[in-house]
């Protein structure tokens, strides 16, 4: 029976079936996953649980999670005003760090774009920003919490470092894709560097810049919630930390999680639409 006559067959007689050979990186990744899975299995099998039953504890954790998701509410440790205020403080913190970061990143992004500055300056700025991006936001916040103390200052400064590094990369790559013909025409007409920037680059790339900035705002909100327990800046993340680690109230945890999730999903939907409209389909 000829295989080419089978329904859905897309090959004819004489064609070779293409096979994909595992490359070195894929083999290394598969081996790493296999080793980690084996170590995890060994650890679970040999761990000393004492008098705690693993499966019983797992069942209780599942029950707590179900309670948290199905019975959110307040238990007297916080008022609804406190929780909503913490949510708006988180949004304000994200907005502040995004605005300041965008201003700084705009200048550094211009200096990092190879079509607007020399290669040495661009290389140095991009290298420094790469190092800053490699350090997790939570670690930056912890560093500044030790350096300048707990509070909004440490949270803003820590979030700012990663925001600047992220936006410099996004802005500089957008600037480098500006129409070279327009830039060359402006330079040939005697335009200054700033005139080239504001007449040839910014008008073309302003939509992309705003889209990247809003995407970073969405990321900063999530980070602001996460760093609340570290910085103690009055954000909703700190209330979540208290509800989970100090008051041990599952219902309050559920309410706070739902509020954070609602805002995060809304921002994510808006960011995705902006990304598709101004960045992917540019």
List each model region and its residues:
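Transmembrane-helix boundary motif in ABC transporter permease subunits
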Residues: 96-129
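C-terminal transmembrane helix and the adjacent membrane-cytosol boundary/short C-terminal tail
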Residues: 251-282
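Alpha-helical membrane-interface segments at transmembrane helix boundaries
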Residues: 84-92, 125-132, 214, 218, ...
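Transmembrane alpha-helices and adjacent helix-loop boundaries
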Residues: 117-119, 134-140, 152, 208, ...
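Membrane-cytosol interface at the C-terminal ends of specific transmembrane alpha-helices
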Residues: 150-216, 223, 269-272
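Generic hydrophobic transmembrane alpha-helix motif, especially the helices
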Residues: 129-163
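A structural signal for multi-pass alpha-helical bundles of membrane permease subunits
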Residues: 41-52, 133, 141-149, 265
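N-terminal, non-cleaved signal-anchor transmembrane helix
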Residues: 1-99, 111, 279-282
């Amino acid at each position: 029976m000829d295989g080419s006559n089978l329904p859905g067959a897309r090959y004819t007689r004489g064609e070779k079936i293409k096979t994909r050979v595992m490359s070195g990186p894929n083999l290394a990744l598969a081996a790493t996953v296999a080793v980690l899975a084996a170590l995890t299995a060994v650890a679970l099998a040999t761990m000393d649980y004492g008098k705690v039953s693993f499966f019983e504890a797992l069942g209780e954790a599942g029950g707590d999670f179900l309670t948290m998701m199905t019975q959110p509410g307040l238990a007297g440790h916080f008022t609804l005003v406190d929780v909503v205020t913490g949510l708006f403080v988180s949004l304000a913190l994200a907005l502040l760090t995004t605005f300041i970061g965008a201003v700084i990143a705009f200048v550094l992004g211009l200096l990092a774009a190879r079509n607007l500055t020399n290669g040495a300056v661009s290389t140095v700025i991009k290298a420094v920003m790469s190092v800053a991006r490699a350090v997790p936001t939570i670690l930056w916040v912890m560093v500044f919490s030790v350096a300048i103390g707990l509070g909004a200052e440490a949270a803003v400064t820590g979030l700012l470092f990663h925001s600047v590094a992220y936006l410099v990369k996004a802005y500089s790559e957008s600037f480098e894709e500006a129409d070279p013909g327009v830039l060359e025409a402006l330079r040939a007409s005697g335009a200054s560097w700033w005139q080239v920037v504001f007449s040839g680059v910014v008008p073309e790339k302003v939509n992309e810049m705003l889209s990247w900035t809003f995407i970073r705002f969405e990321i900063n909100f999530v980070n602001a919630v996460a760093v609340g327990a570290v910085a103690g800046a009055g954000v909703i993340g700190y209330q979540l930390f208290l509800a989970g680690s100090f008051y041990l109230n599952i219902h309050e945890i559920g309410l706070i999680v739902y509020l954070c999730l609602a805002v995060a999903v809304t921002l994510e939907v808006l960011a995705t639409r902006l990304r598709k409209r101004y960045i992917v389909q540019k």
